[in-house]
Amino acid sequence: MYKRQILYDETPLHKKNFIELSESGQFDSTIFHRVIENFMIQGGDINLINDEDVIDYTIPAEFNNSLFHKKGEIAAARMGDNVNPKKESSGCQFYIVQGKVYTEDELTLDINALYGGVRRLLEEEEYADTRQKFIEAQNDPQETQKLAISLSSVIEDKYGIKIRKDLSADIVSAYTSVGGVPHLDGGYTVFGRIVEGLEVIDKIAAVKTGPGDKPVEDIPMTFKVKKINKDKITKDYGYTYPE
């Protein structure tokens, strides 16, 4: 299965590291060792195939608001915040985003704020009829959410609670069309993108897995580095390099 990817200039440390590991052949024969459908496919663990810590360093986080977790993006895996508060990236492990397509409401609504406002509203006597509607819909999560969303403007005006998240038009457009994993934004460094062979992600994500979300049959990978003129990349794939 063939994929082509580009690496972002906005994340120079990750780009340099990824190219060096690819050119040296260290990524070759590594596997996708963690696969979760509608989420992501993770691989590149050089230490796993060597049974020792060949890669024992981390890379400082390189967050950029213009780079987010839409489908096909490549991001660095890392240890959790409890042991890695600076969110530094693994020296070799990465994941490719699959995710899912979101509605605009799913994407932009702060559900906790919304339902907190709904609870306050339903305590008021003037909303007794609305409270009854929620009681009647209590066994229908979709109808309950629909009712809650219909009250979002009332809650914002009445209590000054901010219900909608401030997201750029580009982010909303991406997550409501190609999809992705928005809750990872700002927590993991996105440093590249699959630009050809996007369907391969879906094929890998759909394989049978066992304990630890590891595919039952190994899915190995190999890498080749090819330098392409920046103007050609912009023309063919729509990525504009920063000045």
Predicted feature descriptions by range:
Residues 3-243:
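Cyclophilin-like peptidyl-prolyl cis-trans isomerases
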